[in-house]
């Protein structure tokens, strides 16, 4: 990805995987090695926070039941609705994704300019996000362990996790589409070694 105004090259790496598969951990490790991390979910989160700038649109789309007693959006209620209703999830994505993309582009043009950027995107291949990347990475993890990690981390039921997974491509398909694969089927040290090898490879392509 070329920044035409300065000539400095920003190398954009999209990273994905299944929910609870270790995307964030891998991203953090790569940040420690020198990458600039951008988390798509964190960018999107501000639009479903209590001070959401699109509150009216959210209520029109999902109904007033998403509001708490103070009239603020409840992210848990939003998740329960959209992950069990593919049509509403699609419409929510259509509402939020352009806003997130705009925020993302602003970061690329300012603080991330000229750097190796690791962009954590759960729906990397389900959307056109992968087309913006210089390289794509899928984290390969044990599905059952990933589900258990998500249940523990998010304090949700297994059926809620399975509902989220249903709205994503299968891990096998994400692995097929990726330029690189990070194996996360061991301990943190083995994942760190995988990241170290990947970083070295990608650094060579950036220079």
Swiss-Prot record:
Q: Which reaction does it catalyse?
A: 3'-dephospho-CoA + ATP = ADP + CoA + H(+)
Q: Does the keyword Kinase apply?
A: yes
Q: Name one Pfam family in it.
A: CoaE
From the UniProt record, give one GO term of the biological process aspect.
coenzyme A biosynthetic process
The name of this protein is Dephospho-CoA kinase
Instruction: From the Swiss-Prot or TrEMBL record, state where the protein is found.
Output: Cytoplasm
Q: Where is the DPCK domain?
A: 12-207
A single Gene Ontology MF term assigned here is: dephospho-CoA kinase activity
Write out the residues that bind ATP. 20-25
Is Transferase set as a keyword in this record?
Answer: yes
* Primary subcellular site in the record, as a coarse category: cytoplasm
Q: What InterPro entries does this protein's entry cite?
A: Depp_CoAkinase, P-loop_NTPase
